[in-house]
């Protein structure tokens, strides 16, 4: 079942009048509705969201953190999630049946999450089992669909975040000889390498050709990486780093581990969104930084730290296009429909999928 089949009802067309409203009028209406609804309304906002949206967020953070905060907010009947599909799915799975999770724009997806669908994954597991038998455990990045989390849950696996990936990969190897990591090959590769697993003991599963790509001995493969990636972090290159080293030799380079192995290896630091934020905050005044992550977040960090010289690692970087679909007009539209007693763009994950996906989430939460 696709996510669009799981969501009822579906509204994707923003009414015309929101295109003609001034920013001031929209901001005023959002404030009015937030004040009117009080604790009945909770708006989580991901770090990659636009400032025009983040300013109204009741909590800002990464995807799992926001889902957990939403789940702990029992007073909120409506959770208007300013993020992308898989984040809203996770929030729905962790909240109660009485709470309603709404995504302001149904087009706000995640290309990386969509790179691993359940049919491809089931087929891959079947083929890999022919090669490796019962020696594998699946781990999925939380940046994945509910169906993929459920797959991991029913096959003894778990979810991971960029913050706890090392802990969870280490745990996985106490369970089985081999790890299947999806959907982001780069986070999987960088994490495994950081734990001492050589590149020639890693393979890549291509879901489009149903083939395993590897250089070494197939019997020695320890990590099978799904051929997926983040389209934003894929755009940071070693050439970007070489340019910074040449033109700004005293500048620190910090990147997200969704960047490719070569970029992470050439950087000074690599870590999760929270790690990047904390590193910049704790850095001394006057320090210089080139950051390799999503542009909305980089711009926000620049604004928050005028005492430091901060640039994007890639000067031509664009924000995450799907994350950027959540804007002020869509946020206001979602809030006004709630105010009228209507519900649009509701995220509702199948009960069986939820049960199995929560197994995977809990296996992670119990260990970190």
UniProtKB/Swiss-Prot annotation:
Family as reported in the entry's similarity comment: Belongs to the quinolinate synthase family. Type 3 subfamily.
Gene from which this protein is expressed: nadA
Species of the source: Bacillus cereus (strain B4264)
Binding positions for [4Fe-4S] cluster per the UniProt entry: 110, 230, 320
InterPro entries: NadA (IPR003473), NadA_sf (IPR036094), Quinolinate_synth_A_type3 (IPR023515)
Keywords from the UniProt entry: 4Fe-4S, Cytoplasm, Iron, Iron-sulfur, Metal-binding, Pyridine nucleotide biosynthesis, Transferase
Annotated binding of iminosuccinate, by residue: 46, 63, 141-143, 162, 256-258, 273
EC class of the enzyme, as a word: transferase
GO cellular component: a single term: cytosol
Any one GO molecular-function label of the UniProt entry: quinolinate synthetase A activity
Keyword Iron: yes
Alphabetized Pfam families for the sequence: NadA
Transmembrane annotation, as ranges: none
Subcellular location(s) per record: Cytoplasm
Top-level taxon of origin: Bacteria
Protein name as annotated: Quinolinate synthase
């Amino acid at each position: 079942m696709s996510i669009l089949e799981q969501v009822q009802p579906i509204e994707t067309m923003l009414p015309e009048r929101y295109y003609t409203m001034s920013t001031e009028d929209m901001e005023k209406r959002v404030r009015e509705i937030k004040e009117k609804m009080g604790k009945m309304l909770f708006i989580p906002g991901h770090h990659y969201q636009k400032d025009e949206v983040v300013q109204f967020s009741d909590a800002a953070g990464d995807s799992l953190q926001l889902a957990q905060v939403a789940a702990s907010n029992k007073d909120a009947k409506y959770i208007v999630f300013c993020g992308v599909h898989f984040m809203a799915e996770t929030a729905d799975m962790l909240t109660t049946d009485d709470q309603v999770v709404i995504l302001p724009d149904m087009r706000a997806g995640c290309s990386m999450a969509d790179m691993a669908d359940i049919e491809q994954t089931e087929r891959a597991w079947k083929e890999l089992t022919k090669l490796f038998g019962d020696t594998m455990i699946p781990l999925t990045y939380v940046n994945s669909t509910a169906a993929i989390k459920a797959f991991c849950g029913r096959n003894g696996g778990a979810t991971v975040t960029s913050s706890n990936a090392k802990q969870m990969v280490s745990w996985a190897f106490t369970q089985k000889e081999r790890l299947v990591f999806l959907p982001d090959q780069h986070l999987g590769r960088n994490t495994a390498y950081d734990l001492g697993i050589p590149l020639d003991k890693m393979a890549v599963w291509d879901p489009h050709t149903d083939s395993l790509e590897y250089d070494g001995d197939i019997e020695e493969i320890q990590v099978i990486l799904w051929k997926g990636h983040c389209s934003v972090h894929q755009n940071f290159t070693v050439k970007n780093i070489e340019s910074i080293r040449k033109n700004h030799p005293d500048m620190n380079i910090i990147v997200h581990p969704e960047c490719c192995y070569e970029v992470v290896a050439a950087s000074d630091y690599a870590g999760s969104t929270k790690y990047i934020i904390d590193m910049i905050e704790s850095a001394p005044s006057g320090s210089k930084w080139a950051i390799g992550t999503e542009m909305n977040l980089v711009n926000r960090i620049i604004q928050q730290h005028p005492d430091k010289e901060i640039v994007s690692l890639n000067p031509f970087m664009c924000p995450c296009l799907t994350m950027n679909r959540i804007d002020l007009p869509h946020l206001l539209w979602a809030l006004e429909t709630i105010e009228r007693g209507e519900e649009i763009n509701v995220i509702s994950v199948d009960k069986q999928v939820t049960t199995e996906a929560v197994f995977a989430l809990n296996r992670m939460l119990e260990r970190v």
